[in-house]
Amino acid sequence: MTQFHRWPLALAMAGTLLSVGCSSEQPTEADPSPEGSASPDSSTASETDSRVLGAGTQALAAGTYEVDLGEERLPNIEITVPDGWTSDDGWVVRNGVVNTPHWVAVQFWDVDEVYAHPCHWRDGLIQPGPTVADLATALADQPLRDATEPVDIVVDGFEGVQMELSVPADMPARRYELGDDVYADFLGCDRDEVVGDRAFKSWTGVPGSWGGSERYQQGPGQVDRLWILDLDGERLVIDATYLPSTDAQDRGDLWQVMESIRFET
């Protein structure tokens, strides 16, 4: 089951208030390099010969994999993960199950519009414009996100910015479970009539693109470290995200996975 799909609340068991804390981590300038990145022997990275992440949920052995976003305008992406990580539909790689202690994730997004207010998202959407700076400005202006100042970065030869967004740690939310997955119902936010819960939403994906149709957040205190990159005129957002329950080891693994990213040009 894709970790970023929200199931109707009526199908799940509502109940426990989410317990949260604050993150004090600050973004640092990104200078990705092979040193320090997870780099196991590729011969042990998968039980199959395929290195391309595909549809569905795929358990991953340690190694380097290929992300094909299905867009000729974008290069394929190499990403190296530790043992025990999982791929969801080829555009999300994660460790653990959302809202459990070891959960972290990296997502790839083709962002279209930004919600004017992430909690009261029925107020409308903003079309930020096509550039890296346009999107960074729109996200920095979004209420309740405590956005950091965008920092210039270069990732495998491509320029962009890094910034962090967060969800207020004291935002009331109730968790509900379905199978192995745990979701957040943000009590003060607008209700999603399709899903049935109250959502905290950041942006929408370009219609018809890979991946998710909208970026909703998984819980109070969640942090998203964003790389907004210009790939020869095409914008790509890479979102490394974690929750307050994530420990330092798992956050360290998350940053190593991000720093392993290379583009096949």
Where in this protein do the model-derived segments appear?
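N-terminal targeting sequences that direct proteins away from the cytosol to non-cytosolic compartments
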Residues: 2-119, 209-213, 218-220, 230-265
